[in-house]
């Protein structure tokens, strides 16, 4: 999608223009002192872009600037798109949210749960209830990520080759069978843990729809919404627009270029990762957030019903508790106190517990390379921040962005 531009004066939609400039002034320092390579920020209200700015470089070594059409690896900002895809199928009657995952992935019929022992000799018991589609959408399945480095099951994932993604050459179907053979961290539905659940959900989408995940995204979501640059890899003709990927290694303070991981975006992946595989642009993701703000509809194209979007963006954790209370808020991308979890989104339930400017009912997520977005229905506000620095916990970009956006609202 091209033609991204500011299309309303900020003061016409309740912003103080001078206060909005504080966003740019603050994040310029991140580039000037070398913490970030470059960034793009987009702030929209009532469907109109009120603030759009770029700064720094998409490729530091080649001195190429961040531009409005720069392509970014959005990593876990893929998850909301996968969740929307699943709920589109749910609306069509393809499954119930309570259906066992084993209906679509038979290897999930006999999962076992870790109860003790070591990562080398785990003690397990059968799952009391099946892993259900609802558990995948809410990250309450008991699955995990190998890169958490917290629980013995995390180490079991790493030993099996699942630290980041899956072993080379493995496709999504095989990865799901591999994950099903490993112990769950807890009984399904009993805790929250950020995990490969959304990748498994991607496989459910494939089986339920009879389409590969990339085809489903392209035909059912991206094409209808005009998201022309969003895909699982960047075509050769567009690769000069792709930002380089940087990382701050553990125990260090300086960012380094990470081409080994970054260059995977330039070729079609064997594993279509609904949990983190997409590359996109600010314009495309803006279209996606506007569809959400429009309760499932954008420019006459409806992907979801209004009640479905409302349900997805409501805290689904039992008793209305937050992520901090219900489970293991490791790598929750955007915080855990005062924040519940819906069907694919973190949801602000208690702004006082968040201890920062925000709105009740705002929903959001982020990605491994420090990207972030949120949708605030109460303020008709959407915000997108794109950069390419791993891990996302390196700097407090997301809370700082929140406070700088909300302090500029004056109506």
Task: Kindly give the residue locations of the regions a language model identified.
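Short, conserved catalytic-motif segment at the N-terminal edge
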Residues: 4, 11-74, 94-96, 110-122, ...
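Short clusters of small/polar residues that mark proteolytic maturation junctions
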Residues: 54-56, 260, 387
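Short glycine-rich, acidic/polar surface loops and turns
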Residues: 344, 360, 365-375
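Short, conserved phosphate/pyrophosphate- and ester-handling motifs at nucleotide-, phospho-/glycolipid
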Residues: 16, 79, 281
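Acidic helix-start/capping segments at beta-turn-to-alpha-helix junctions
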Residues: 102-109
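Short, surface-exposed loop or secondary-structure junction motifs
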Residues: 2-3, 110-357
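Active-site SXXK
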Residues: 24-27, 47, 73-101, 198-206, ...
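Short, well-ordered beta-strand elements
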Residues: 50, 373-374, 380-389
């Amino acid at each position: 999608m091209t033609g991204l531009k500011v299309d309303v004066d900020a003061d016409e939609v309740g912003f103080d223009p001078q206060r909005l400039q504080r966003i740019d002034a603050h994040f310029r320092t991140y580039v000037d002192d070398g913490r970030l390579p470059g960034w793009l920020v987009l702030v929209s209200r009532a469907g109109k872009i009120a603030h759009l700015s770029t700064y720094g470089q998409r490729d530091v070594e080649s001195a190429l600037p961040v531009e409005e059409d720069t392509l970014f690896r959005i990593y876990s900002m893929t998850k909301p798109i996968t969740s929307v895809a699943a709920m589109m199928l749910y609306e069509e009657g393809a499954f119930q949210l309570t259906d066992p995952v084993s209906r679509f992935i038979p290897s999930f019929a006999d999962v076992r749960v870790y109860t003790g022992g070591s990562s080398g000799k785990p003690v397990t018991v059968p799952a009391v209830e099946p892993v259900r589609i609802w558990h995948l959408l809410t990250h309450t399945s008991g699955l995990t990520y190998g890169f958490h480095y917290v629980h013995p099951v995390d180490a079991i994932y790493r030993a099996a080759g699942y630290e980041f993604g899956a072993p080379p050459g493995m496709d999504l179907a095989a990865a799901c069978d591999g994950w099903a053979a490993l112990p769950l961290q807890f009984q399904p539905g009993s805790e929250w843990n950020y995990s490969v659940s959304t990748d498994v959900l991607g496989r459910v989408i494939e089986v339920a729809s009879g389409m590969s995940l990339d085809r489903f995204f392209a035909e059912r979501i991206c094409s209808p919404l005009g998201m022309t640059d969003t895909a699982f890899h960047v075509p050769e003709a567009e690769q000069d627009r792709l930002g380089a990927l940087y990382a701050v290694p553990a125990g260090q303070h300086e960012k380094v270029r990470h081409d080994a991981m970054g260059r995977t975006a330039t070729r079609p992946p064997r594993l279509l990762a609904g949990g983190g595989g997409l590359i996109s642009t600010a314009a495309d993701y803006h279209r996606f957030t506007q569809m959400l703000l429009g309760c499932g509809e954008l420019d006459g194209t409806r992907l979801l019903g209004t009640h479905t979007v409302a349900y997805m963006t409501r805290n689904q954790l039992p008793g209305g508790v937050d992520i901090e209370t219900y489970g293991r808020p490791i790598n929750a991308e955007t915080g855990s106190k005062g924040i519940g979890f819906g069907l694919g989104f973190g949801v602000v339930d208690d702004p006082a517990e968040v201890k920062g400017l925000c709105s009740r009912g705002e929903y959001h997520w982020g990605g491994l390379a420090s990207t972030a977005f949120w949708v605030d229905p109460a303020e008709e506000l959407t915000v997108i921040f794109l950069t390419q620095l791993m891990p996302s916990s390196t700097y407090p970009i997301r809370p700082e962005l929140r406070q700088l956006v909300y302090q500029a609202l004056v109506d």
